[in-house]
Each structure stands twice: as structure tokens, then as C-alpha cells.
């Protein structure tokens, strides 16, 4: 096949030329984005992943090239050679990085034609997400998406450079592994050579990185693909990428310290932003008490206050009965929000109902200091005074109350706090506020299964001072776990691990994993821990989520090259898809048909 390029070779990309390059002869290659004819002179915006350059075809310079340019259409692939000229006065485009120059073309080659695209390959084109994902290769040409993909590369390169400099080893772990379901479902892969047996795709490299610590590789990392068969949300994908770290001979502060340095380097080198270290610390208890959520957004105040002790003896039976049953009454002072209409309050009441709240009580403080509220009449002067002091009430304030069990109360008010902050414009979108949340509960009680389950995973070490509670009060045991939170979003989490087999067996037993089941699922880990496992810990960052936050995108699908839909489908390749009967037969599998279909 003939070489369409001939002697042409690209000298510059479409985003690099500036006024200083005037007079140079250059060769550019890319896609024709826009085509315009002004008085017989043809202007084409030539695009590649680096940017856009205006190229000009004047019939007086080369009539043959001009005639060929007249045939070019949107998204054709072309190569041009010509001279860089400074744009005439009044023709400079300040919106383009190359807007001070243009290239007067002397030679043109059409490298490939294109069908008419199903949508304009431009950032401002209105197009459905499904169509974008079906033609993802076109969507990836759009400057905004291309910028996100390049940002992804830059962050990955920065992370690797930092960890390499700090003596971490990039070690691959298996993709086909054993199914040890904890929480989310595993993706299963049938084995052809071992009929009836299955591999699982890893939800994380957790166990293998711990085994690497046992093996003596004291600093490990991977930017690794992980898989979870779970329902999708805006920030979830069935396959995702995480920055995975593990270190030996460390405590919590060592792991958090290296993670802070890594994130600070990413922000400085990639984003040009200085990040103050060390990051703030909040215990899980403090986070829940003050913000209602274990992922608090600290860019604004609006702290929550418990008022259970003030209202437990009040005549307002809704509050008093909740406290009597062991629940909680909590409040949030929305400063200066007494102007909120009843409709707004009704909307917020419906909002907290999503999180299980049965109602949203409220009090407006009028200019004379008196209360306007359906519940004001139920409180004595002493109770009012105590609430006013606890909640720092002042004229113009609006106080919201939720009374329910501890989980519902915190969940409802925590999300209400975020909602009100957005509506009041309290959030500085240019601020990056980090916080470590520490000392999570080791376990939580599952009401459905009537047993304790690990809050993070069953390999998390309990705090030394709580070991005596493992058998008597498991729910009170704090773990050596830590989450890094940025602007109310969990960036990553980790823990110090259990490194002694006796303690690991004890925790398994507390979680209802008998010796036989523990041996079946995790026998290889218990065996390894018995061969001199060092104290170790680590963490994993959600790489996709980090890129989403850095790029300012609202959907994780806009920062992944080839994402799945909310139904875990790839519209580009039409996956998942049926497979041939012969393939199933080789695996000794048969599809059970739905009787309703």
C-alpha cells in the first residue's frame, strides 16, 4: 500500500505554535474540525489532542491545493505544510492558545475521509451520553474529554515517579484469583481445564500485597484494575483503577505521611496548587458527632449539635420518646436562613426522608429573639435557653432538628448539611480541603444476618487498647483504619493490618467465620502469617475518583477512556454479549433460561 504521507512528517502538533514561530515552515497533521469559506479563501480548524490551529488555503498561493481543500469535510484526516503567519489585526482569537497565528498552506494531503459524525466533535455539542458512549472514539476527540485523559496520564506518571523515588516497587499481582466474597459480589471466571471450578477477578490486591510484605518486599505499589459486581452510581464502575500501597514496619502515621506527600506532589506538579501538610485529623466519633458523616466536607461550618439531654424531659413527645428509646435528637443551625419559605422547608423535609428521617422539625429565630415554630410551645424557658446557648441561636437563624435512631439522625442531618451549604453558596469550589478520618469501628452489626461484619475488611488490626473488648463488646472496638477525605469525598482508605495468625483467627471467629470456613477461604493467608509476617499497613486510593475531582467533572464516566453505563454495559462493543454454545460446552456450563422470557 502506498505511503499516503509521502515525504511529509509532522514537525509540530496543533497546540504548540505561537507568534514567536512566525516565518517557520511547519507540517501539521490532524482532523478537520471546522471548515469556512470567506471570499474564496478557505479556513480550516485543524485539531489533534494537543489543541487547534487555524490553517488557510488561498487560491492565489496554490490553486490546486485550494481546490483539494474545498472537498474536505468534518473529521477528515489531513496533513498540511505551510508557513506560520501572524494573524492580521482584528483577527486574533484570544480563546485559542494558537489564536495569534495561522498557517498559510502550500501543500495538502488527505490521509483519510470520514463519514458524517453522529454529533459535533466539540465541547459545547449537546448529545446524549448513550450516543457518546456508543461512538466513544469520537467522544474522546473532544477537547474536554481529551484533557481529562491526558490529566489521567499526568497524575499516574507523577504518582509512579514519587513512589519510585521513595523506594516502592511496582509489583503486579494476579488477575485470576480465588473468590473470597466480602461485601460486593465477585466477577467469576470459569476454568476450562478445571471443570466446575471458578476464578474470581480481584476486588482489590489486598491479600497478595500482604503476602508480599510477608515475603520481605517492604514497599509495594500498583496502579491496578479492580472489579466489583455491584449496582452502579455516578462514581462507581464495575471495573475501576486504584493506587494501591503497602508498607512494612510502619504505624498509621507512617502510611498517612507518605500518602500526604504523594497527594501534595500531585497537586503541585500536575495542578500547580500548594497543599498544606500534614492534613487535619478527625476521629470517626468526632466526624459523626460534628458532621453526621464519616466523609465530612470541611470547606464550611454548619456543625451539628446533639440536644438529646435538653429535650428528653420536654413536653414535645416526638423528641422525648426517641431519647427514651435510645435514639438521638440532633440539630443544625443554618445561620441567617430564617428567610427560607415553607416550600423550601417542605422540600428539605422530603430530602431528609430519603435518608430515613420521619420528619424535619424547625425553629426560626425572629428579629426580637422570639421563636417561630410549630414546636416552640412545647419547651420551657429553661429548655429554650439551653438550646439557644448550645446552638448559638441568634435573630435570623433557622434551626433544623432530626429525631431518630443514631444512624438515621446522623445520615439525614449530615446530608442536609451538605445540601444547605450548596444552596447558600458556602462552598468554595476552588478550595481543596483534606482530612484524615481515623479510629473507625472495627465491626458493625448486620441486622439482616444478625452478626457482626467488618466495617472495612477482616484483615484490619484492632486498636491495642480495645483488645479486651473483642469478645465482650465487639461493636465498641476501634480499628487502626484511616480514610483520606477531600471535600466530602473519600479519596482513599487503608489500615494497619493484622500480622499475627492468632489475632487473625480471633477476628475471623468474632465475625462468625468458623475455623473450617476461615481455613477454606483464607487458609493461605493464615499459613503465611505464621512464617514471620512483619507489622505492616497500607492504603488504596480511588484513582478514577481522584481524577474526577481534579478535573471538576461530575461523572466518573467522563474521565475513563472506555467506561461502562449504569447498567454495566459497554455500548461501544455491545458487551456483555451472548457466547457460542460451543464455548459454554467447553466450560461445562449451561444457561438457565428465565421462564418469563
UniProtKB/Swiss-Prot annotation:
Binding site for ATP: 228-230, 237, 490, 542-545
Catalytic activity: tRNA(Asx) + L-aspartate + ATP = L-aspartyl-tRNA(Asx) + AMP + diphosphate
Keywords: Aminoacyl-tRNA synthetase, ATP-binding, Cytoplasm, Ligase, Nucleotide-binding, Protein biosynthesis
GO biological process assignments: aspartyl-tRNA aminoacylation
Keyword field contains Protein biosynthesis: yes
InterPro entries hit by this protein: Aa-tRNA-synt_II (IPR004364), aa-tRNA-synth_II (IPR006195), aa-tRNA-synth_II/BPL/LPL (IPR045864), Asp-tRNA-ligase_1 (IPR004524), Asp-tRNA-ligase_1_N (IPR047089), Asp/Asn-tRNA-synth_IIb (IPR002312), AspRS_core (IPR047090), GAD-like_sf (IPR004115)
Binding-site residues for L-aspartate, renumbered to this chain: 182, 228, 456, 497
A GO CC annotation given for this chain: cytoplasm
Top EC class, one word: ligase
Site keyed Important for tRNA non-discrimination: positions: 38, 90
Enzyme Commission number(s) from the entry: 6.1.1.23
Transmembrane stretches, start-end: none
Main location class: cytoplasm
Pfam families reported for this sequence: GAD, tRNA-synt_2, tRNA_anti-codon
Xref: NCBIfam families: aspS_bact, PRK00476.1
Family: Belongs to the class-II aminoacyl-tRNA synthetase family. Type 1 subfamily.
Quaternary organization: Homodimer.
Protein's name in the database: Aspartate--tRNA(Asp/Asn) ligase
Amino acid at each position: 500500500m502506498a505511503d499516503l504521507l509521502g515525504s511529509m512528517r509532522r514537525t509540530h502538533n496543533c497546540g504548540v505554535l505561537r507568534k514567536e514561530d512566525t516565518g517557520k515552515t511547519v507540517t501539521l497533521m490532524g482532523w478537520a474540525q471546522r471548515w469556512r469559506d470567506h471570499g474564496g479563501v478557505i479556513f480550516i480548524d485543524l485539531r489533534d489532542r494537543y489543541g487547534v490551529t487555524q490553517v488557510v488555503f488561498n487560491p492565489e498561493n496554490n490553486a490546486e491545493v485550494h481546490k483539494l481543500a474545498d472537498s474536505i469535510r468534518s473529521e477528515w484526516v489531513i496533513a498540511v505544510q505551510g508557513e506560520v503567519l501572524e494573524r492580521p489585526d482584528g483577527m486574533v482569537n484570544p480563546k485559542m492558545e494558537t489564536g495569534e497565528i495561522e498557517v498559510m498552506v502550500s501543500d495538502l494531503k488527505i490521509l483519510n475521509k470520514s463519514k458524517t459524525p453522529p454529533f459535533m466533535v466539540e465541547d459545547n455539542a449537546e448529545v446524549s451520553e448513550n450516543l457518546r458512549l456508543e461512538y466513544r472514539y469520537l467522544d474522546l476527540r473532544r477537547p474536554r474529554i481529551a484533557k481529562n485523559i491526558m490529566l489521567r496520564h499526568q497524575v499516574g506518571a507523577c504518582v509512579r515517579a514519587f513512589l519510585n523515588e521513595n523506594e516502592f516497587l511496582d509489583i503486579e499481582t494476579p488477575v485470576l484469583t480465588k473468590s473470597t466474597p466480602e461485601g460486593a459480589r465477585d466477577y467469576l471466571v470459569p476454568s476450562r481445564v478445571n471443570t466446575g471450578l471458578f476464578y474470581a477477578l480481584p476486588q482489590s490486591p489486598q491479600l497478595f500485597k500482604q503476602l508480599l510484605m510477608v515475603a520481605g518486599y517492604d514497599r509495594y505499589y500498583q496502579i491496578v484494575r479492580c472489579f466489583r459486581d455491584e449496582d452502579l452510581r455516578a462514581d462507581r464502575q464495575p471495573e475501576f483503577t486504584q493506587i494501591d500501597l503497602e508498607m512494612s514496619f510502619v504505624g498509621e502515621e507512617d502510611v498517612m505521611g507518605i500518602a500526604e506527600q504523594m497527594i501534595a506532589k500531585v497537586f503541585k506538579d500536575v495542578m500547580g496548587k500548594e497543599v498544606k501538610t500534614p492534613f487535619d485529623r478527625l476521629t470517626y466519633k468526632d466526624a459523626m458527632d460534628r458532621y453526621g458523616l464519616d466523609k465530612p466536607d470541611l470547606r464550611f461550618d454548619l456543625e451539628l449539635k446533639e440536644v438529646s439531654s435538653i429535650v428528653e424531659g420536654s413536653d414535645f413527645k416526638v423528641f422525648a420518646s426517641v431519647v427514651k428509646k435510645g435514639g438521638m435528637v440532633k440539630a443544625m443551625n443554618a445561620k441567617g436562613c430564617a428567610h427560607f419559605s415553607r416550600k423550601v422547608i417542605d422540600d428539605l423535609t422530603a430530602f431528609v426522608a430519603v435518608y430515613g428521617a420521619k420528619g424535619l422539625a424547625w425553629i426560626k429565630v425572629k428579629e426580637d429573639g422570639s421563636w417561630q415554630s410549630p414546636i416552640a410551645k412545647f419547651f420551657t424557658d429553661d429548655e429554650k435557653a439551653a438550646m439557644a446557648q448550645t446552638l448559638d441561636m441568634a435573630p435570623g437563624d433557622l434551626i433544623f432538628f432530626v429525631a431518630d435512631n443514631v444512624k438515621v439522625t446522623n445520615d439525614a442531618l449530615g446530608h442536609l448539611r451538605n445540601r444547605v451549604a450548596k444552596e447558600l453558596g458556602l462552598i468554595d469550589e476552588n478550595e481543596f480541603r483534606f482530612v484524615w478520618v481515623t479510629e473507625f469501628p472495627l465491626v458493625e452489626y448486620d441486622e439482616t444476618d444478625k452478626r457482626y461484619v467488618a466495617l472495612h475488611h477482616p484483615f484490619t488490626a484492632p486498636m491495642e487498647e480495645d483488645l479486651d473488648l473483642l469478645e465482650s463488646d465487639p461493636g465498641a472496638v476501634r480499628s487502626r483504619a484511616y480514610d483520606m477525605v477531600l471535600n466530602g469525598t473519600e479519596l482513599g482508605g487503608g489500615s494497619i493490618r493484622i500480622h499475627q495468625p492468632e489475632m487473625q483467627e480471633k477476628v475471623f471467629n468474632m465475625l462468625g467465620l468458623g475455623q473450617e470456613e476461615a481455613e477454606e477461604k483464607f487458609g493461605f493467608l493464615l499459613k503465611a502469617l505464621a512464617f514471620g509476617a512483619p507489622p505492616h499497613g497500607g492504603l488504596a486510593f480511588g484513582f478514577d475518583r481522584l481524577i474526577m475531582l481534579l478535573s471538576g467533572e461530575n461523572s466518573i464516566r467522563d474521565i475513563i477512556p472506555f467506561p461502562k453505563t449504569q447498567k454495566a454495559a459497554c455500548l461501544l462493543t455491545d458487551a456483555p454479549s451472548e457466547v457460542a454454545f460451543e464455548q459454554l460446552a467447553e466450560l461445562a456450563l449451561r444457561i438457565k433460561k428465565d421462564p418469563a422470557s
